[in-house]
Amino acid sequence: MLREGTQNRLMGRCRQLLRFVLPVECLSCGHPLSTDPVPFFCAACWHTIRPLHQPVCARCDQPFVSPAATTYTPNHQCRYCQEQPPDFERAWTLFPYLPPLRDAICSFKYRGKLTLARPLAQLMINALPQGLDADVVIPVPLHPARLRAREFNQSLLLADQLGRHLSRPVSATNLVRTAVTDPQTALSRQARLRNLRHAFTIRRPHDLAGKRILLVDDVFTTGTTLNECAKTLRKAGSGQVFALTLARTVETDLVPDRLLTEQTGRPLTTLGI
């Protein structure tokens, strides 16, 4: 028979373990979960996720501060796309990388909460741009060493759901990452370019000859990873390369405060701005 104090300590540890495995609180707002349709998130938070607003760059979906940016040229491109046109034909990104979506992506990607793959992919499917079409869907690959460490490729899990929805084959082994690169997160745009140069290769170029490719990734930051993949595919003889990402980082000097608060439902102070 365990003493009462020992029993209480054991029960407390069991509750902590259970909360880690099966959280009873929303990972975004901390409110108790009940029968919410999305794992780890309450319905109220999930429903605050809003698509990226117009106006955006006609090539890479970079948000513009003002609608005046496209007043005279509807197909206006951002400075980066004008100065150094990307190798992809068009990149669509569907949502701003802000809470609660940011919380969901981080939990999915870095904490292994794989049950979020389906609802995140469904967000992408629900917001697919009109006219999107391709012959093959390809996820941005991880280097084998990083794949072994993480045990899954988040981009492949998203691409698999998209391929099913679009009735298109998903090629997960043709575009491969051959170089171990430093994490892109803390690097500048130029450092990212240097970091990823010659990082990818194509195993079977004939399988992709002339085919339109849809690259899929989770987050668009500067676009250097997608662009290096697109460059590799084009050099191997593919047709047009398009890119689709679930979310993109938004810079506070490019996106008005109003947009940030509208798309999160939270005051700026809670966003750390």
PLM region spans:
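Glycine-rich phosphate/pyrophosphate-handling loop used in enzymes and phosphotransfer proteins
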Residues: 1-216, 221-273
